[in-house]
A protein has these predicted regions:
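Outer-membrane beta-barrel porins/channels
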Residues: 25-51, 79, 116-420
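Positively charged n-region of N-terminal signal peptides that target proteins for export
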Residues: 1-7
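Bacterial N-terminal signal peptides
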Residues: 9-21
């Protein structure tokens, strides 16, 4: 048995030193180690009203989640607002980590499915000031789990399992005030906290050799957001948002274990890394076409050229470009009386273009979004769907999202019973 162990040592050495080189040559495209699931261009949580109208949010005051991208809109919410949003996400991937990068091949795209609580928050108005609090799941680092087996003559010779999970949460506090009847300013501070966990387990059954590679990282950081809302006229309003570059700090630990019936070798390491996040600028507009129909347009700029990332003490090169995400949408409302109350039923329709920053694989997602809802002066229930198709990678990746949002406005007297 010792002879067999020595025989496989060169293979083990090749596995851990040559494989990273192969990965660097083939590349995972959009899904590098730290890439969020779905898109790099994330700027706060998506709720149903914004999602359904082409991801347009910068000039739309729909719920308390505005503190994540334009806190000035807090002044446009009812005096007391409680917001809850959840979503189901279905995202296709082709290449990531060891999958379709020269080590493990699949016949087609793999799918990651998640159901998550996107946002929970509240806003409260006191005089000319409005304060907002919120917690949100802003990024998901999960990947489809995969198990590989090499079988010959109904005998398993080799098997491998890979797994990656993780997420990033944002805990926000925001303050906004009206300078006059047309102009509002706001600012938010968001504390980000999350983790990323990756594991590889490979086993040669005949020789009873096992390799375990485990990595765990804690992510922390503070992000600031400043916002402006300005009503040019009774029909046209603008929203402006700014989030300056900032640093995420990452604490990581890893263990590499080699097991045989006669040998156990374990190597542990720790690292402190820094991730430089980019500048984000946003401009949004709202046009009231008539009493039933509103139009929205959002443009978001992400300065990915200056993005920097280190992984367990080593700087990783990211060949990124700056990106501009554009969304446009409509909201049409009908009104009716029921049970002594006035109700509104909004219908959403939108389009969005979401280019990814990687220069080697110029990938872009194109979205069709739609949704509906029901609301009165007390509550608002909305649900929307985004259907996305990717172009540029050669794999026609699909991304679907279903969002459900509930907003509760218990302060009826101050709200004057009006539905916006």
């Amino acid at each position: 048995m010792r002879r067999l162990t020595l025989k496989f040592l060169p293979i083990i050495i090749m596995y851990f030193f040559i494989i990273p080189t192969l990965l660097a040559q083939t590349g995972p495209g959009q899904y590098t180690e730290e890439a969020p699931l779905g898109s790099w261009n994330i700027f706060g949580p998506d709720t149903a009203a914004g999602l359904g109208s082409g991801f347009c949010r910068l000039a739309r005051a729909s719920s308390a989640e505005v503190i994540y991208f334009n806190p000035a809109l807090l002044t446009k919410l009812p005096p007391l607002t409680l917001s809850l949003s959840s979503s189901f996400n279905q995202t296709q991937l082709f290449s990531y980590w060891l999958v379709n990068t020269g080590v493990i091949s699949t016949r087609g795209n793999l799918t990651a499915r998640t159901w998550q609580l996107d946002h929970l928050g509240l806003s409260w108005r006191a005089g000319s000031w409005t304060i907002g609090l919120g917690m949100a799941l802003t990024e998901n680092y999960g990947r489809p789990g995969l198990e590989y087996r090499y079988v010959y003559n109904q005998v398993v010779y080799n098997q491998m399992q890979i797994r990656q999970v993780g997420h990033l949460s944002g805990y926000a506090i925001g303050l906004a005030g009206k300078l006059n009847q047309r102009l509002s300013l706001g600012a938010s501070l968001i504390y980000e906290r999350g983790y990323l966990e990756r594991s590889l387990d490979e086993f040669w059954t005949q020789e009873e050799i096992q390799l375990l590679d485990y990595r765990y990282q804690k992510v922390k950081g503070f992000r600031a957001v400043a916002g402006l809302s300005y009503e040019i006229s009774g029909r046209l309003s603008l929203g402006l948002s700014l989030s300056p570059p900032y640093i995420r700090k990452v604490k990581g630990e890893s263990s590499l274990t080699y097991l045989t019936p006669l040998t156990e070798i374990e190597t542990r390491s720790q690292a402190s890394d820094r991730v430089k996040r980019p500048l984000v600028l946003g401009l949004g507009g709202k046009l009231v076409i008539n009493q039933h129909l509103d139009a929205y347009l959002d443009v978001l700029y992400f300065g990915w050229k200056r993005y920097r990332f280190s992984y367990f003490g080593e700087d990783q090169f990211r060949n990124f470009r700056d990106t501009v995400r554009i969304g446009a949408g409509l909201e049409y409302r009908t009104r009716f009386r029921f049970l002594g109350r006035t109700w509104a039923s909004p219908y959403y329709l939108g389009l969005a273009v979401d280019p990814q920053p990687d220069l080697e694989v110029r990938s872009t997602y194109y979205f069709l979004t739609f949704g509906s809802g029901l609301k009165n002066e007390l509550l608002s229930l909305s649900f929307s769907t985004a259907l996305g198709l990717e172009s540029g990678s050669g794999h026609a990746l699909k991304r679907h999202k279903l969002s459900i949002s509930l907003d509760f406005h218990p302060d009826l007297k101050k709200n004057s019973g009006k539905i916006k």
